[in-house]
Amino acid sequence: MDYFNKIIIDIELHHVEGIRECFENGINPNDLFHGSPLIDEMITMYTRTPRFKECIKVFVDYGLKFEDPVLLAVLMDDSEMLDKLILQQPEIVIKRYSLKCTYTPLEDVTLLHICAEYNHDACARVL
């Protein structure tokens, strides 16, 4: 089976177990897809479901290297992690991000905008 093509479909469908299966069969969460990190495909895909944060957690469980722990906390809707990070660096609540999402490009937005885009209300409450 071609697990690399499979994971792209599973990412599009937010198929948590399918993504896990791909990682179990040799796909690395830090691989590139069309020159960008595979996680970017997950973040920028047009699908929006409650399973999104579970998919992100599977990437993390299998060794995702993600440079921005604050953004990662929001993408996972991990309000406890976000709260700890804000206590360490309160200025992060006004940091700006740009994500090239398929339907709604998020250009120069705050973490709260990202919470709204992905319907991550636990982190939105912290912010």
List PLM regions with ranges.
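Short, intrinsically disordered, charge-balanced linker/junction segments flanking boundaries
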Residues: L112-H113, D121-L127
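Ankyrin-repeat helical core positions
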Residues: I11, F23-E24, I43, T47, ...
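Ankyrin repeat domain, specifically the short helix-to-loop turn at the C-terminus of the second helix
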Residues: R20-N28, E54-K65, I86-L99, R125-V126
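N-terminal alpha-helical scaffold/docking segments in eukaryotic complex subunits
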Residues: F4, I8, H15-G18, C22-N30
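Ankyrin-repeat boundary/"N-cap" motif
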Residues: M1-I9, D31-Y46, K65-L75, K95-I114
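Conserved ankyrin/ankyrin-like repeat signature
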Residues: G18, R51-C55, M81, A122-C123
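Short helix/loop capping segments that flank catalytic or ligand/cofactor-binding pockets
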Residues: K95, N119-H120
